[in-house]
């Protein structure tokens, strides 16, 4: 039986709405991975269980505190850069304090078992790698690196953090602990007293090595991800609303090639109508269940699998056949984030 047939069969045997954990509710996902050679596209929803918020909740409504910095703002305004680095400096300790969750460990276990052809992540937190995953393409870059916009040299964020602390010994945020956003910065009003540092090699402007809103994803990276999807037997989307074209285009490409797409997300996504099957469920417990179903160990150092600790239990899970989205949110021109 082909992967397309197997996924379709599992999907058709599921009710559209189930409450509480249903073993068959993740059968379609387990079946997809059982065939192997599956590409994974992950989004912010995979990291929420690690304490890093996503841009949109289950309702699909944006819930970021403040507007994200655009590339044009960052490069065109000294004040904008000062504001960004002050906020990001505070948010950085939150990012470095985050640990991989059951979802990340499940993905690493599936990859280690040879069932994953590659991982494309829209996240910039590095948690896939921290969980032990190896074949990871960071579509939007990484907060753990910094790039100079003049000489293009790259350095670690840890090094920059030390320089920022040295340059701002008396700088503190007033008030309560600020809310952290998905891109690692925080909501902070007063930033005028913050000192920004430049490249140690040439004195140029430093930027986190991530793709800002309004900035292009590097073409070689885009094409490498297209090649991965085209050469895989299936595409599984984990925790992405697919609101922006940078992720949606891979679902569209897989669909156009007849490659089955399974989407696991809490809430609807922009790609649901193209999916072979969709599953509305928490990522951690779902991937834990899949790993157990396939007889694998997760990527913890002791190889154990703790369902109770990772919240495996009650919840609401919805698996549905492909459906049309009544409202599609169009973002970007197809080439941008």
Where are these regions (language model features)?
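Conserved catalytic core of sirtuin-type NAD+-dependent deacylases
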Residues: 1-337
């Amino acid at each position: 039986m082909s992967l397309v047939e197997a996924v379709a069969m599992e999907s058709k045997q599921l009710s559209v709405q189930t409450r509480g954990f249903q073993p068959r509710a993740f059968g379609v996902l387990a079946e997809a991975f059982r065939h192997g050679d599956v590409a994974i596209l992950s989004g912010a929803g995979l990291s929420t269980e690690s304490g890093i918020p996503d841009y949109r909740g289950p309702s699909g409504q944006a819930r970021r505190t403040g507007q994200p910095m655009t590339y044009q703002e960052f490069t065109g305004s000294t004040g904008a850069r000062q504001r960004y680095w002050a906020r990001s400096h505070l948010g950085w300790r939150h990012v470095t304090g985050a640990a991989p969750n059951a979802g990340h460990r499940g993905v690493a276990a599936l990859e280690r078992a040879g069932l994953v052809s590659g991982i494309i992540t829209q996240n910039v937190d590095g948690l896939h790698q921290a969980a032990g995953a190896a074949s990871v393409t960071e579509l939007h870059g990484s907060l753990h690196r910094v790039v100079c916009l003049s000489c293009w040299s790259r350095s670690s964020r840890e090094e920059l953090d030390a320089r920022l602390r040295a340059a701002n010994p008396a700088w503190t945020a007033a008030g309560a602990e600020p809310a952290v956003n998905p891109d690692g910065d925080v909501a902070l009003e007063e930033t005028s007293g913050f000192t920004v540092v430049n490249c140690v090699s040439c004195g140029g402007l430093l930027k986190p090595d991530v793709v800002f809103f309004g900035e292009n994803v590097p073409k070689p990276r885009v094409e490498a991800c297209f090649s991965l999807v085209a050469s895989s037997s299936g595409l599984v989307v984990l925790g992405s609303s697919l609101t922006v074209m940078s992720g949606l285009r891979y679902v569209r490409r897989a669909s156009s090639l007849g490659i089955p797409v399974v989407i696991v997300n809490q809430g609807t996504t922009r790609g649901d109508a193209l999916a072979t099957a969709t599953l509305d469920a928490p990522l951690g417990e779902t991937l834990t269940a899949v790993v157990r179903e396939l007889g694998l160990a997760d990527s913890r150092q002791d190889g154990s699998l703790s369902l109770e600790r990772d919240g495996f239990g009650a919840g609401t899970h919805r698996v549905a056949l492909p459906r049309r989205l009544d409202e599609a949110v169009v973002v970007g021109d197809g080439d941008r984030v």
